[in-house]
Amino acid sequence: MRILFVAAECAPFAKVGGMGDVVGSLPKVLKALGHDVRIFMPYYGFLNSKLDIPAEPIWWGYAMFNHFAVYETQLPGSDVPLYLMGHPAFDPHRIYSGEDEDWRFTFFANGAAEFSWNYWKPQVIHCHDWHTGMIPVWMHQSPDISTVFTIHNLAYQGPWRWKLEKITWCPWYMQGDSTMAAALLYADRVNTVSPTYAQQIQTPTYGEKLEGLLSFISGKLSGILNGIDVDSYNPATDTRIVANYDRDTLDKRLNNKLALQKEMGLEVNPDRFLIGFVARLVEQKGIDLLLQILDRFLSYSDAQFVVLGTGERYYETQLWELATRYPGRMSTYLMYDEGLSRRIYAGSDAFLVPSRFEPCGITQMLALRYGSVPIVRRTGGLVDTVFHHDPRHAEGNGYCFDRYEPLDLYTCLVRAWESYQYQPQWQKLQQRGMAVDLSWKQSAIAYEQLYAEAIGLPIDVLQEA
């Protein structure tokens, strides 16, 4: 099949959230399965320093009364063609840049549509989040081009009806209430990034006021769990951690813990229960819940706690003050550093993800990959990847709690801390987590099926397409 990914982000060179990981990884796996996969994204001002981009464009287009250029390069580490839409609107040195976002990304979506009509015609356009939401509307009258729309985060829905009509000149009845709603209405297939999240967003609690529409289109709505790049995130070969190891050589992992304790200014002690937390410091990630019980948990136990992330100033201040109250036991780094995050995955005993909601979640998968036992709230993709440890039957790969309540999180942390004291059992728990297949392979096969459904292609002739 000929598949064009259209997205605002692509890892590793233009990433803000999980969408970038998907767009940077899934096309490579689909390419290996024999499909002609290409990526279309904005030519941001910072990309020249990260990619080898030719000076001359391959094509000139016209959209929304503006000319634009398209440049061709390749996705790093692959032979997947990468098309960059060049226009002064994308020159700012950041992906999301303020009040003109609605116009910029609607223009980008229109440019992708023009590119597909006039330069390279795919069978399927795979659209990602609200930035590309108008593409299914414009492609609705193109019988030879189908669309698949992926919801990465329903909370961000794009410009609403009054502004969208002004930007696009499309009548309101073609738009829905936002670009997200327009995509849900007109895309041939819609999916989220985990099966559980696909069910949850059809309820008022998680539906962000679109639960009625999502229930209405449930026949074309599905959930496909994200994967991770298991070659890049491999504790046996990762050059950014102190000691390499695998699930059969877990004894070597201790060197990473001791090095992390030293790097973070903690007491260097192999017997301390070390918990890692890497996330944006916002309410979605459960930071408000954590702050209600962390002081009590640290005073009750001898555990250590490390935080890496940035976010809302109030949460940053609270975490910083807690770290000053527990020197040698808690460390807070208000920044993001990819190398340090990997060292936290490799050196922590457990990894906390207490999210209020989580479409998929990548950090718990990385924790499993590196042998850090995840402690999570059962929501979204966390339900599909982390299963509660049952010591009676040697089952599960982490610790889970259900209600978004301080007592539930506190109880779960205490249970994990107590279990850590029984090292033979804990190491088996780590090994079960490291044995989970977290690659993109199964997800890519599911996307193949989704594309086939979108274009009406029988699955038995999929490989011949």
Curated annotation (Swiss-Prot):
InterPro entries the record matches: Glyco_trans_1, GS/SS, Starch_synth_cat_dom
Assigned EC number: 2.4.1.21
UniProt key word Glycosyltransferase: yes
Keywords: Glycogen biosynthesis, Glycosyltransferase, Transferase
Superkingdom assignment: Bacteria
Reaction equations catalysed: [(1->4)-alpha-D-glucosyl](n) + ADP-alpha-D-glucose = [(1->4)-alpha-D-glucosyl](n+1) + ADP + H(+)
Gene Ontology MF terms in the entry: alpha-1,4-glucan glucosyltransferase (ADP-glucose donor) activity; alpha-1,4-glucan glucosyltransferase (UDP-glucose donor) activity
Known pathway: Glycan biosynthesis; glycogen biosynthesis
Residues annotated as signal peptide: none
EC primary class: transferase
GO biological process: glycogen biosynthetic process
Annotated residues for binding of ADP-alpha-D-glucose: 15
Family that this chain belongs to: Belongs to the glycosyltransferase 1 family. Bacterial/plant glycogen synthase subfamily.
Function field: Synthesizes alpha-1,4-glucan chains using ADP-glucose.
UniProt-recorded name of the protein: Glycogen synthase
The gene coding this protein: glgA
